[in-house]
Design a protein with these regions (language model features):
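Central regulatory/effector-binding core of bacterial HTH transcription factors
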Residues: 1-34, 104-105
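Residues at or immediately flanking beta-strands
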Residues: 2-4, 98-102, 137, 149-151
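Structural detector for helix-capping/boundary residues
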Residues: 8-11, 20, 45, 66, ...
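Short loop/turn segments at beta->alpha junctions
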Residues: 9, 64, 106-107, 125
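Hydrophobic residues within well-ordered alpha-helices
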Residues: 16-18, 68, 113-119, 152
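A ligand-binding cleft/hinge motif common to bilobed small-molecule-binding domains
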Residues: 26-35, 85-87, 94, 108-136
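Flexible hinge/capping segments at coil-to-helix
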Residues: 36-47, 51-73, 164
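A late-sequence structural motif
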Residues: 74, 127-129, 136-182
Length: 182
């Protein structure tokens, strides 16, 4: 068995599933699965505000979305990340403004790097705070925070034993309470 981790966008990962180049893919909704595939939710996490360390809002414990109305945003492009993009847009619209997107980046690591360089601020999945990026501060969103959803997609049938075991293990990691009750 060989495990290879590849970072890509949802459309590319689903193409990899269809072409049998990928056995299990972590994808973000919305997406359309062909009938031979299935998916299940593995993560529903609040998003955080990513700020350069010298930003005035980095001194606060938590930040309401409305406080970002005059900020420049660095976001994931909608065509390759509609779920994250729409969650951020909708949260900002509920707070009374449309985010001023001055830069888009196709990978979360690039977004974090651009924020650290002072290009703008962003709203990112909470897991990004564990990436060890230097020169960046993360703050919880005060009030109604958008959520980042992550699903595991895989072939419904015709999976190798290794792929079946990987799906089972990942399912147990994502839902330990269900595994304990089984």
């Amino acid at each position: 068995m060989r495990i290879t981790l590849t970072e890509s966008n949802t459309q590319s990962l689903l193409r990899g599933l269809r072409e049998s180049a990928v056995d299990v893919a972590f994808v973000r909704p919305p997406y359309v699965l062909d009938a031979e595939f299935e998916s299940e939710r593995v993560l529903d996490e609040p998003m955080l505000i990513a700020l350069p360390p010298d930003h005035p809002l980095s001194r606060k414990r938590s930040v309401p979305i409305a406080a970002l109305a005059d900020e420049d945003f660095v976001l994931y492009p909608r065509p390759i990340g509609a779920g994250l993009y729409d969650a951020i847009q909708n949260a900002c619209l509920r707070a009374g403004f449309a985010p001023r997107v001055i830069q888009e980046a196709p990978q979360m690591a690039s977004i974090v790097s651009l924020v650290a360089a002072g290009v703008g601020i962003s709203i990112v999945p909470a897991a990004m705070r564990h990436m060890g990026a230097q020169g960046i501060e993360y703050r919880p969103i005060k009030g109604d925070a958008p959520h980042a959803l992550l699903d595991m997609a895989y072939r419904r049938h015709d999976r190798s034993i290794a792929a079946r075991n990987a799906v089972d293990m990942l399912r147990q990691l994502a839902h330990p309470e269900a595994a304990a009750g089984a």
